[in-house]
Amino acid sequence: KTNTGATAYMGFLNAIAGNPEVLTEKHLENTNLIKDLTDLFKGVERVSGDETFLKEMFLNNDEYEAVIADEASLININTMLKNKKKEELYLIYPIDGVAINDSAFGFIDNKSNKKETFLKLQNYLLSDKFQGTLKEKGRRTWYGGTNDKVNEKVFNPDWGIDTKKYLNVTKFPSKKVMTEAINLYIESLRKPTHTVFCLDYSGSMNGTGIKELTSAMKYILDYNEASIDKLQFSKNDKITIILFSSKINGIY
């Protein structure tokens, strides 16, 4: 549901497939791979489409024992746990590879005389002051390699963070294979969901309102349309639709 979740999933795929040079469609058809991934995802209790919501969900529920997130988010979570005098997390890095977001920042010449502004912003982002701020927030300002000059109160070794150790980088397949892999997760690997739609059919929805509602539901429930944005349901999901106005008009 997030960049971190998707990249973690690709890492799981590569590892369970035996770390092939390139992940292919044939790997995704392997029944043993699908079984192993299904068993892995049985341990997932919740997912989130937003890193901030994921953090809040984890911090506000003591039942969760682990969370998959980016390093900076986990550092932030641990800082908050420490302040609350709660047990802190220990970070685990898959030896098969992690994804590194290099936060590319580029300029597209649109002939609007904005290059000077772009360069000012770029210089500020690369300044020692701002780079220092990023590091204090748990962001690695060096790409990949090692760094032995960090604030260990932030990159805390007691939390399993070792900036002196080189991180292996996840190998990503082609866009087509990634799309099929995500569809495989949505339609076969994740736990099934029960989604309830409560649709307002009252008089206030007459005209444009009901047309937009109907159009939205057609989009969501049409597999081909919904799959464009990875919103499709799987055959194991349960869908309930409740129509209401001043009373419940029907349940389907």
Show which residues each predicted segment covers.
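A conserved helix-loop-strand patch within extracytoplasmic ligand-binding domains
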Residues: 1-15
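Ligand-binding pocket segment of bilobal, Venus flytrap-like solute-binding proteins
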Residues: 20-91
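Short amphipathic alpha-helical coupling segments at ligand-binding clamshell hinges
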Residues: 113-125
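Periplasmic-binding protein-like
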Residues: 124-146
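Acidic, polar low-complexity linker/tail segments
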Residues: 141-196, 203-211
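Von Willebrand factor
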Residues: 189-252
